[in-house]
């Protein structure tokens, strides 16, 4: 992998000079192979090491180079043709392949090549961008968007119309991460590299970016960019410094352990505020 890293880093330094006509064969093959590895889940843009999420920026650079160098092509679909630089992930799948991977994809869901979808996953009509990683047992409901490089954990439920923000540029930005066993309520937006930690429940219509205040009503603590594990979060507001108006905030109304989460319905947790 070190060889790939060096080739990609060197190519990215020259990205404004490189094009389809002058790129060398080794660099082109490396870029395509990195995207193949992403597509198969053998590498990922971000991974958790020693309980800390680490972003592999060189993989993001590979995606950008792939997009710079690819030409638009026509892709055939059952309902429409498409014209894009990145092919569709499942354009060559047959029934046997879907069954082997235990994935259900409902039309007209769009999943771009270079994203990874693990087994036992259901994808309703939605959009999954390149570089995204969706782990096993996850449900992506209707009109949900999983942005570029977003990381979705195991047994996650992304409800209808949810937006999970993508990030390719600026390079220093980290991807949005939804950890294992989370529930994201309908029409919520989690963006700008925010991390929703394991076992959290986000109510309908909650918007969280890096500048959003995340208020823990039990402790009075205000967080940014991270929802702690096993939190139940709803939309709310906090008074301004001069107390003349209120500003939007996400409010942690309670924390629940995994046993409670397994026993109690999500709707009940949100009602008992």
UniProtKB/Swiss-Prot annotation:
Q: Which organism is it from?
A: Buchnera aphidicola subsp. Schizaphis graminum (strain Sg)
A molecular function (GO) held by this record is: 2,3,4,5-tetrahydropyridine-2,6-dicarboxylate N-succinyltransferase activity
Q: Which cysteines are joined by disulfide bonds?
A: none
Q: Which domain of life is it from?
A: Bacteria
Q: Tell me what reaction this enzyme catalyses.
A: (S)-2,3,4,5-tetrahydrodipicolinate + succinyl-CoA + H2O = (S)-2-succinylamino-6-oxoheptanedioate + CoA
Q: How does it assemble?
A: Homotrimer.
Q: What are the record's GO terms for cellular component?
A: cytoplasm
Q: What class of enzyme is it?
A: transferase
One GO BP annotation is:
diaminopimelate biosynthetic process
Q: Does the keyword Amino-acid biosynthesis apply?
A: yes
Q: In which pathway does it act?
A: Amino-acid biosynthesis; L-lysine biosynthesis via DAP pathway; LL-2,6-diaminopimelate from (S)-tetrahydrodipicolinate (succinylase route): step 1/3
Q: Which UniProt keywords apply?
A: Acyltransferase, Amino-acid biosynthesis, Cytoplasm, Diaminopimelate biosynthesis, Lysine biosynthesis, Repeat, Transferase
- Which gene produces this protein? dapD
Q: Where in the cell is it found?
A: Cytoplasm
Q: Which residues bind substrate?
A: 104, 141
InterPro entries noted in UniProt: DapD_Trfase_Hexpep_rpt_fam, Hexapep, THP_succinylTrfase_dom1, THP_succinylTrfase_N_sf, Trimer_LpxA-like_sf
Q: Does the keyword Glycosyltransferase apply?
A: no
- Taxonomic lineage from the root: Bacteria, Pseudomonadati, Pseudomonadota, Gammaproteobacteria, Enterobacterales
Q: What is this protein called?
A: 2,3,4,5-tetrahydropyridine-2,6-dicarboxylate N-succinyltransferase
Similarity section: Belongs to the transferase hexapeptide repeat family.
């Amino acid at each position: 992998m070190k060889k790939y890293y060096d080739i990609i880093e060197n190519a990215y330094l020259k990205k404004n000079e490189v094009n389809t006509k002058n790129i060398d064969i080794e660099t082109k093959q490396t870029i395509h192979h990195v995207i193949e590895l992403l597509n198969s889940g053998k590498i990922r843009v971000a991974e958790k090491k020693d309980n800390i999420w680490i972003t592999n920026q060189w993989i993001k650079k590979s995606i950008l180079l792939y997009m710079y160098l690819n030409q638009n092509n026509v892709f055939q679909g059952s309902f429409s043709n498409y014209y894009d630089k990145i092919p569709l992930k499942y354009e060559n799948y047959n029934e046997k392949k879907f069954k082997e991977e235990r994935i259900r994809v409902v039309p007209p869901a769009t999943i771009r090549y270079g994203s990874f979808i693990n087994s036992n996953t259901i994808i309703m009509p939605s959009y999954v961008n390149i570089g995204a990683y969706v782990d096993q047992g996850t449900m992506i409901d209707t009109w949900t968007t999983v942005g570029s490089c977003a990381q979705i954990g195991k047994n996650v439920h992304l409800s209808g119309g949810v937006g999970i923000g993508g990030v390719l540029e600026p390079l220093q930005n980290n991807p949005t991460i939804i950890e294992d066993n989370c529930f994201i309520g309908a029409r919520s937006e989690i963006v700008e590299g925010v991390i929703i930690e394991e076992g959290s429940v986000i109510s309908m219509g909650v918007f969280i970016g890096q500048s959003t205040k995340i208020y823990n009503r039990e402790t009075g603590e205000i967080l940014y960019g991270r929802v702690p594990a096993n939190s139940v979060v709803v939309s709310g507001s906090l008074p301004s410094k001069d107390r003349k108006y209120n500003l939007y905030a996400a409010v942690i109304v309670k924390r629940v352990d995994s046993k409670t989460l397994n026993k109690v319905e999500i709707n009940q947790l949100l009602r008992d505020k």
